Amino acid sequence: MYAIIVTGGKQYKVEAGQAIYVEKLDAQAGDKVTFDKVVFVGGDDTKIGTPFVDGASVEGTVDKQGKEKKVVTFKYKPKKHTHTKQGHRQPYTKVTIDAINA
């Protein structure tokens, strides 16, 4: 059985026992999280939401909080001695899927 959930403005296809990286959630490592925005549940009994499946949820456990690799942006204007260097590290949350309730 698998499900498609929406979190952080993105859709993820998940199965029980799978670890996924999602946009930062306000939870600590070891906390339980529930995703209520389930768009699709597949398996023996397929359910399609309009836009979400009623009564369906996905439960998971937060493994860790972290930051991705640094992305460096560099802007310059030729012949003007003007340049700007900026870095960004996007925060993420690693979640292990425990159960799919449909």
Swiss-Prot record:
What biological-process terms (Gene Ontology) are attached? translation
Asked if the keyword RNA-binding belongs to this entry, the reply reads yes
The keyword Glycoprotein is annotated on this UniProt entry: no
Alphabetically, the GO molecular function entries are:
rRNA binding; structural constituent of ribosome
Going by the UniProt record, its keywords in alphabetical order are: Ribonucleoprotein, Ribosomal protein, RNA-binding, rRNA-binding
Top-level taxonomic group: Bacteria
Q: Which cellular component terms (GO) are annotated to the entry?
A: cytoplasm; ribonucleoprotein complex; ribosome
Complexes and interactors: Part of the 50S ribosomal subunit. Contacts protein L20.
Entry function: This protein binds to 23S rRNA in the presence of protein L20.
User: Its family?
Assistant: Belongs to the bacterial ribosomal protein bL21 family.
What is the name listed in the Swiss-Prot or TrEMBL entry for this protein? Large ribosomal subunit protein bL21
Q: Which gene encodes it?
A: rplU
